[in-house]
Regions:
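Short, charge-rich binding segments
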Residues: 49, 79, 102-103
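DPxDG-like acidic metal-binding loop motif
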Residues: 54-59, 65-85
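Residue-level signal for short, function-critical loop segments
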Residues: 60-61, 207
């Protein structure tokens, strides 16, 4: 008898690499430069292996092209599957706000925005952008903001961290945040709070298409 299993996936399209989390402990990392060449093949192979029926997408902040390419590809996959995929869209900052509300991280965070030199200094308590800053200013900022935390990125040389940096992964039913020797867990229900019929690229600013 042939059993056709269904699969929940979580996809981070808001970092320096694309991260696709599937099954209990498997992760696929794609370079940004590979997206247009590898994306379709990866999604189709995953769906053939285990039918994707639910997809949580970390959908902001990041660069215009990759957000657009990924949302279009996932929407196309849903169309090809006769709309048999449930989408949930969550910004990375909303995820970090969940961590903050639980008391797991401080209120100030430096966030990757797809640029080589610049990052966002974001205030989770007041939910606002403090400023766009240069990575070279991190040590100075850490003196000004003692609770400052670095965004998770997959290339550890991007920040060359000298202060605390987030480390989290997704599993089928939860997301876990590593903090030293402690692991904190968010349930899938806490993450899938924004169901959407179609994914829209969640730009941090409007792209210039002129």
């Amino acid at each position: 008898m042939f059993l056709y299993w269904k699969m929940r996936v979580s996809i981070d399209i808001s970092s320096d690499h694309i991260a696709i989390y599937h099954w209990t402990s498997q992760k696929i990392l794609l370079e940004r430069s590979w997206v247009d060449r590898e994306l379709g093949k990866v999604l189709v192979n995953l769906d053939r292996e285990q039918a994707i029926w639910e997809c949580l997408v970390l959908n902001w902040p990041w660069g215009f092209t990759n957000l657009r390419v990924w949302t279009l590809a996932l929407n196309l996959l849903k169309t090809l599957k006769n709309n048999q995929i449930s989408f949930f869209s969550l910004s990375k900052l909303e995820l970090y706000n969940l961590f903050y509300q639980k008391g797991w991280i401080g209120s100030k965070i430096l966030v990757y925005i797809g640029q080589r030199l610049n990052v966002w200094l974001w205030d989770l308590e007041w939910w606002r952008l403090i400023s766009t800053v240069k990575k070279s200013e991190i040590d100075q900022l850490s003196s000004q903001y003692p609770d400052l935390t670095l965004d998770q990125v997959y290339d550890t040389t991007y920040f060359e961290p000298t202060i605390s940096q987030l480390s989290y992964e997704f599993r089928i039913d939860w997301c876990y945040l590593k903090s030293g020797n402690i692991e904190h867990f968010l349930s899938r229900d806490e993450l899938t709070i924004h169901p959407v019929e179609r994914l829209e690229p969640n730009y941090m600013i409007e792209p210039n298409v002129s």
